[in-house]
Amino acid sequence: MKPSILFIVPATYEALKTKGIDHMIFERDEGGFFGKVIVVHPFCPKTQSIILNDCHEIYEVGFDLIPYSKRFRFLKCLQYPIHFFRIVWSTLRLVKKYRIDFIRATDPYWMGLIAYTCGRLCKIPFCISIHADYDKRMQLDKNISVSTVFGSYKLAKLLERFILPKANQVMPIRETLAVKAAANGVAADKIRIIPHGIDLTVFHTLPKNNIWQLFNIDPQKKIISFVGRLSKDNYVDAILEIARQLGNRRKDFLIIMAGGGKEEPKIKAKLASNDVLKKHIMLAGFQPRDVCIDLRRASEVSLCLMAGFSLIEACAAARPVISYDVEWHSEMVKDKETGFLLKEHDVDGVVDALDWLLNHPIESKAMGQKAKALAFKRHDLKGTSAIKVSCYSEILSQGLNH
């Protein structure tokens, strides 16, 4: 009988569909290793269950128990502890109903606390995967809620240091996060690095979309692409300044920003009031994955000043990438080999790099090919799935010995 796993994820199914990444839910069975994959989304607008197929089911717990709690602060605060116990109760029922073998939380804060509580009550193992440098993200944008508890970053850090050492396994997605996990008290023998995996087969096929026609772009324009959330932690303000400076040097480029987010109204206002930005930046909004992939392939350069999955796809598109030297970017962006890796906030350096790449198409193409080779070597789904299956097998053996 195949094992079963329960994920606890800070998301909603609707948001995943909007971002075009809902297809990744189906990758969680690791090529058929799991017979049942249950996903709990603990903080949603409404309570609902979504059956995707015989293997994959999603359960969303709505923050909707007390009427009018969104309008009144007192009712909202009253609902928090009730909601937490509601999540735990719902998760416990799912664990028993589907005979879950172990739980995986996808952050070391609320998701980790829920996994720890349910794991202990059900006497099954739990693991925590770490997907970002939350300290860095918090530094860049104080409004990021995933790394706060009741609005407090300090409380979140205390919870992180309490939860992580208690997990049966901690699975950061890269080396730098493994170092941080160890600093938070996780024993070295509990840490397993699980690189991001992406189904990259689409990058071997022909494009489905003509980007110039789709967005009504002058064919003579050289495209520079940004694909991601329009948020402070993605350095979107820097992209505007980059466009302004590059626009003072040359007129043959267009930066297409595909995505949405909190900074979108502010960016729109700046574009409306600045003729240079208006000429050289297009806000494309959220786009389907196939459009985003074809946009990357139509680009001369990808801007990934801060990126996760999007950096892998940018490299897989066989185009040079420009990134800041933060988080894990140095693993993919080899300076002057697969792109340009620049000091954080070095806007002048980014402008110089873009100008050089646009002027040197042969060298740029060679960098892009190296970037693609590296993406396939490190992050192709088959290889990363094998790593995760190995980690999961270890956890399952711990459950049997519990």
Q: Residue spans of the language-model regions?
A:
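Carbohydrate-associated surface elements
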Residues: 43, 176, 197
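A short helix/loop element that forms part of the nucleotide-sugar donor recognition site in Leloir-type
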Residues: 204-217, 387
